Every structure is written in C-alpha cells, then in structure tokens.
Amino acid sequence: MEEPLGSPPAALSALEKNVAELTVMDVYDIASLVGHEFERVIDQHGCEAIARLMPKVVRVLEILEVLVSRHHVAPELDELRLELDRLRVERMDRIEKERKHQKELELVEDVWRGEAQDLLSQIAQLQEENKQLMTNLNHKDVGFSEEELQKHEGMSERERQVMKRLKEVVDKQRDEIRAKDRELVLKNEDVEALQQQQTRLMKINHDLRHRVTVVEAQGKALIEQKVELEADLQTKEQEMGSLRAELGKLRERLQGEHSQNGEEEEAEIPPQPDGEESISDAEKAALDLKDPNRPRFTLQELRDVLHERNELKSKVFLLQEELAYYKSEEIEEENRIPQPPPITHPRTSPQPESGIKRLFSFFSRDKRRLANTQRPTHIHESFGQWAITHRDDGYTEQGQEALQHL
C-alpha cells in the first residue's frame, strides 16, 4: 500500500515510540497521519464511509493529547509540592525545638532564682547573727580570755569563708546566665535566618511555577502555529495542482480552437511564436502563485506577523503575572502576618479549541476546495483575462486567511 502524499515520516516514528515517551508533538504527528488516511479513504469511497467514525477518532486523539500534556506537567508539580511539605516540616521542627529551649531556659532561671533567694536569706541570717554578736560584745564588761578571742576569730574566719564561697557561687551562676542569654540570642538569629531562607525558597518556587506556566503557553502557541502553517502549505500545494490541471485543459482547448479556425485565425491572431510567448507569459503569471515571496501578503510576512503576535502575547502574560505578584507582595507587607502563603491551585481555564480539531477542519476544507475545483467550468473570456482574474482571487483568498489568523 502506498504511503499518502505529504505524510511526515515523524508520524511513523511516533507510532513506534514507547507510550511513556510520547509528547504533544508526537500526538499531532499521529493525528496528521490519521488525517491523511481519512483523506485517501474519502478519495476512494466518499465522505459517507467515515462520517460517523471521524468524530470518535478526533475525540480519542484529543483525550490522548490531554493525557500526554498532564503526564509531562505532573512530575514537576509533585516535586514542588514535596519541597514545600519538607520546608513546612522543617519549620515546625524548628518551632518545637525553640519551645523546648525556652522551657529549659525558664527552668534554669527558676532554679537560679531559688538558689539566689536561699543565698540571700543565708546572708541576711548571718548578718543578723553578726549584729547580735556585735551588740553582745559591746554590752559585756568582762574581758575576754585568750581562748575566747581565738574562738571568736575562728568564727569570723569561718563566716568569711562562707561568704566567699557564696560569692563564688553567685558569680558562677551569673556567668552561666549570661552564657545562656548569649546562646538564646544566637538561637534567635539562627531562627530568623532560617525564616528568611524559607521566604526566599517560597519566592523561588513561585517564580518557577510562573516560568513553567509561561513555557507551557509558548509551547502550545508554537504547536498550534506549526499545525496551521502545515495545513496552509498543504492547501497551497493542492491549489497549485488544481491550477496546473486547469492550465493543461485550457492549453488543449486553445489548441483545438486554433486547429478548427484555420486560416481565418491565422490572419487575425499574431504568428505562432508570439502566441507561444503570450501563453508562456500567462503561464508565468499563473505559476507566479508558487512563489512564497510574491507581492502583497507573502507567507514569510504571515509567519513574521504570527511570530510577533505570539511574542506580544507572551510579554503581556509575563507583565500580568508580575503585576499580580507585586500586588500580592504589597498585600502581604500591609498585613504583616508571618505565615507561609497557602498553596494556590490554578483554576482550570476553559479548554481551548484542540489542535486535533483544527487539523481535521483543515483537511475537510481542502476536500471541499478540491471538489469545487474539479467541477467543469465554462470559459467565455480569453486566457490572459482568466489568469489575471485567478491571480487576484488567490491574493484575495490569501489576505482573508491572513486576517483570520490575525
């Protein structure tokens, strides 16, 4: 069985690929191959043979396109969700550790306060005893013996040692409290740094989602543009084939008219070489339709306009996303709530017209044009007028298609 004319070899390689490796471009190649097969069946058996089958095939290809696009987007979204969950778990762990550390500091402070209170009470008691001893010493009139003096000096020395030991304990606890305060300050700085890092990672996550959305939109626009250009190219090739067929018919009719008229036409019509030159000029005028860079609206200009339109659309989309991002930042700064923003799931926008339907609509339009061009036409004007008229019609039709694309 012969391969259909103009079918891309990429469609055959797409059919041989693994299911997990399919992309949206492979789905479009498969759709193109199926469309060519439908076209050949229509040529052989008519449109009624596949009138009920074609909508079902189109629906199956659309479902395949959606599944393939979801398969390529889902892993990246899962990775981002896992990263966000991990950051949240880390933040909760840090908060829990900070609470435990705060409780430990409070316990240490309570113990220190209790010990300091005990020491202060002991100091007050010793001072009171010292005062009592001093008063007793002043009121006594009898002299102390040497043994009593040594005993009193021993008691005062012991009190000094107790006071010195108490002072050392207080200084040691004060140093420990200062060290704990410094450690608490360092922990707070670490917590603030981790919060800043979390905020930065959340911004990076938001930017990555934004870039993924922009790249998906640009990819879809490029795929649709490729499908439209391929369909336009096939349409132009079919139009050129029909024009060549009509040109051959006109040549045969002109030769028949020349042979029937005979000598009368030889007197009225210029010599044969000039006729051949006029026919060649008409052929050149008709064949000029093949030139992609012919005047008025060329295919290259159409591509430039479509490319510029897609760039402007992507720039507008980027500006809208940046404006929404800055507005959300201003709202967050006004509210000043230190909590991570909730996960925003993008709303499911209404499904645009699938590239599969657009591709099959081009095939049906090509069929209608071929059916219209194959009908017999009656020519009442000369060959030059016919060529000029069809050239203007071609320019008009090309301009209308360009306006539709724009």
Curated annotation (Swiss-Prot):
The modification Phosphoserine is found at residues 7, 259. S-nitrosylation is required for the interaction with GAPDH. It is found in: Cytoplasm, Cytosol; Cytoplasm, Cytoskeleton, Microtubule organizing center, Centrosome, Centriole; Cytoplasm, Cytoskeleton, Cilium basal body. Residues 262-280 have a biased composition (Acidic residues). GO terms for biological process: cilium assembly; epithelial cell morphogenesis; nitric oxide mediated signal transduction; protein transport from ciliary membrane to plasma membrane. Disulfide bonds: none annotated. One of its GO terms (cellular component) is cytoplasm. GO terms for molecular function: dynein light intermediate chain binding; protein dimerization activity; small GTPase binding. Residues 294-359 form the RH2 domain. Residues 255-280, 330-354 are annotated as: Disordered. Interacts (when S-nitrosylated) with GAPDH. Interacts with RAB8A; interaction is dependent on the phosphorylation of 'Thr-72' of RAB8A. Interacts with RAB10 and RAB12; the interaction is dependent on the phosphorylation of 'Thr-73' of RAB10, and 'Ser-105' of RAB12. Belongs to the RILPL family. This is RILP-like protein 1. It comes from Rattus norvegicus (Rat). The lineage of its organism: Eukaryota, Metazoa, Chordata, Craniata, Vertebrata.
